[in-house]
């Protein structure tokens, strides 16, 4: 986390994009897919917004895919947003578009499961390289925003897991957010000690 915030104090609101049809079908929907939100996903976001789940933000960033941009426009209509080029979902490779049921019996999938998700996806990305890429994008955001800002980040589940596990030192799968849900991450301290407090959104 060297120099992540240059001793700045900020609050980051991480929100996973709303549901797509593939999400509801429990399929791997990654970098290769630019699927937009389904009606059920849109309606769920609107309901959560009306219930006051999403706090106001000073700055807004979102992933490049339609599902992230549509989510940003539903939750924060009219708010300017920036799209960091790094913020994409992981490349699931041969698992893209397939469900757990469809992958049962696939030896490559079994090996990946047994590794705890640490093996690279066949013909896709490794978790290690993906985390590095996501942290590069997060560093840019952290440098860009002024101190004491509340920063919205609407992204993919993988992006959220990568960043929060890297800055907290906890496990990658400790930060699995449901669609439309997420985490509030407060980062504060000085050049000697960086503190990170993460709570579930809502």
Regions found by a protein language model. Give the residues of each.
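Short active-site segment of divalent metal-dependent hydrolases/proteases
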Residues: 20, 159-160
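Glycine-rich phosphate-binding loop signature in dinucleotide/nucleotide-binding domains
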Residues: 52-56, 141-149
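Generic beta-sheet signal
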Residues: 12, 149-157
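Active-site-proximal alpha-helix that buttresses catalytic centers in soluble enzyme cores
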Residues: 9-11, 15-79
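Domain-level recognition of soluble alpha/beta enzyme cores
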Residues: 168-195
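Short hydrophobic/aromatic-enriched beta-strand-loop microsegments
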Residues: 17, 79-86, 171-180
């Amino acid at each position: 986390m060297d120099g992540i915030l240059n001793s700045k104090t900020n609050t980051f609101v991480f929100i996973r994009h709303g549901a797509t049809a593939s999400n509801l079908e429990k399929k791997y929907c990654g970098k290769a897919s630019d699927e937009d939100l389904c009606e059920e996903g849109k309606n769920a976001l609107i309901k959560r917004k009306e219930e006051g789940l999403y706090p106001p933000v000073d700055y807004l960033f979102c992933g490049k895919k339609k599902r992230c941009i549509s989510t940003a426009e539903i939750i924060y209509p009219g708010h300017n947003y920036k799209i960091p080029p790094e913020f994409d979902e992981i490349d699931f490779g041969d698992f893209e578009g397939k469900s757990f049921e469809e992958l049962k019996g696939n030896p490559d999938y079994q090996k990946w499961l047994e590794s705890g998700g640490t093996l690279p996806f066949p013909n896709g990305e490794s978790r290690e390289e993906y985390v590095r890429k996501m942290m590069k994008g997060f560093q840019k955001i952290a440098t860009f925003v002024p101190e004491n800002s509340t920063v919205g980040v609407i992204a993919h589940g993988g992006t959220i897991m990568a960043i929060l596990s890297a800055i907290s030192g906890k496990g990658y799968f400790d930060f699995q957010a449901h669609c439309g849900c997420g985490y509030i991450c407060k980062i504060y301290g000085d050049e000697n000690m960086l503190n990170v407090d993460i709570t579930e959104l809502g």
